[in-house]
């Protein structure tokens, strides 16, 4: 009985261990792909964010360098004297226009909301709290005094018989017994194997000559067994060609051939559109009267 109980307990422990092992292996097989996919997703996201930060930094540096290159010295303001009323302007101020500068436009529309940030670091531990109030009740509960011991009761009924005990140890081997009386003879055994051939005996005396009689053929004997199969015959003539089979599958494309020879040059294209007219040139005119030089705008230099 005890051995059966132990065997059942051992079987239960073994099955439980195997079940827990299988559950652990299954959980590992299920969680590993999930962890790998999450790590790869986080890695790709970090890679995209790093690339975005690098691109933003490059754009900022490029804008700063562009502003440094285009920010030349400030030209001095040309403050001329006031014109006399009714008189011609002596030194007119040049018409300075800022072609390379532009005012910033209105702000663009608001962009899409960014991704939620990562959780912050845990805060510092708080200060210790104030001590609590003293307890009203005592810490250790008071136990009432024990009751007086009761008198001993009558003996109970006898219990059921116990289980049989374990088998005892093996006893020591006994002494060997005395030899028994010889038994009755057994049955006759099978004949033994044939003995070796004896030596040849002496040659006998020659017999009397036989009477000569004509030979008479005997009766025909029984037909003999069939002989072994003969050797294979010569190969036959080749048969006629069978019908053509179905077309085979399309083969893989072959390698690219060598480049072909250059073709002939095409005809000349149509003439392009007429260009914009050039700047008006300066053509001086000479005057023979006083030797001065006049230009088309009427000025003299």
From Swiss-Prot:
InterPro entries found in the cross-reference section: Col_cuticle_N (IPR002486), Collagen (IPR008160)
Region listing for Disordered, in residue ranges: 109-284
Residues under site feature: Cleavage: 289-290
Annotated signal peptide: 1-37
Record GO cellular component, one term: collagen trimer
Region (Triple-helical region): 105-134, 153-179, 183-209, 218-283
Residue ranges of the region described as Furin-like endopeptidase recognition region: 79-82
Key word NAD present: no
Biased composition (Low complexity): 194-210
Family to which this protein belongs: Belongs to the cuticular collagen family.
Stated role: Secreted collagen that forms part of the nematode cuticle, which functions as an exoskeleton and a barrier to protect the worm from its environment. Secretion and subsequent incorporation into the cuticle is likely mediated by bli-4, which probably cleaves at the N-terminal consensus furin cleavage site.
Subunit description: Collagen polypeptide chains are complexed within the cuticle by disulfide bonds and other types of covalent cross-links.
Name the record gives this protein: Cuticle collagen 1
Taxonomic lineage of the native organism: Eukaryota, Metazoa, Ecdysozoa, Nematoda, Chromadorea
């Amino acid at each position: 009985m005890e051995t059966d109980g132990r065997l059942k307990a051992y079987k239960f422990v073994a099955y439980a261990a195997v079940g827990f092992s299988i559950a652990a292996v299954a959980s590992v097989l299920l969680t590993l792909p999930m962890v790998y996919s999450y790590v790869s997703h986080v890695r790709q996201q970090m890679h995209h964010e790093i690339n975005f930060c690098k691109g933003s930094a490059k754009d900022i540096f490029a804008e700063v360098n562009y502003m440094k290159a285009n920010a030349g010295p400030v030209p001095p303001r040309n403050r001329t004297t006031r014109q006399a009323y009714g008189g011609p302007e002596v030194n007119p101020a040049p018409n300075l226009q800022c072609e390379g500068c532009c005012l910033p436009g209105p702000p663009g529309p608001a962009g899409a909301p960014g991704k939620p940030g990562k959780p912050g670091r845990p805060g510092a531990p708080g200060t210790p709290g104030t001590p609590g109030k003293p307890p009203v009740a005592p810490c250790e509960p008071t136990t009432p005094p024990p009751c007086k011991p009761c008198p001993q009761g009558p003996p109970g009924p006898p219990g059921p018989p116990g289980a049989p005990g374990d088998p005892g140890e093996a006893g020591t081997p006994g002494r060997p017994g005395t030899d028994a009386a010889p038994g009755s003879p057994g049955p006759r055994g099978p004949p033994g194997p044939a003995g070796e051939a004896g030596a040849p005996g002496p040659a006998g005396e020659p017999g009397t000559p036989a009477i000569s009689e004509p030979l008479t053929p005997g009766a025909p004997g029984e037909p003999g067994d069939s002989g072994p199969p003969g050797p294979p015959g010569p190969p036959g003539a080749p048969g006629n060609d069978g019908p053509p089979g179905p077309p085979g599958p399309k083969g893989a494309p072959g390698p690219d051939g060598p480049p072909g020879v250059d073709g002939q040059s095409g005809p000349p294209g149509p003439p392009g559109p007429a260009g914009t007219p050039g700047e008006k040139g300066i053509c001086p005119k000479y005057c023979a009267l006083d030797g001065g030089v006049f230009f088309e705008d009427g000025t003299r230099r």
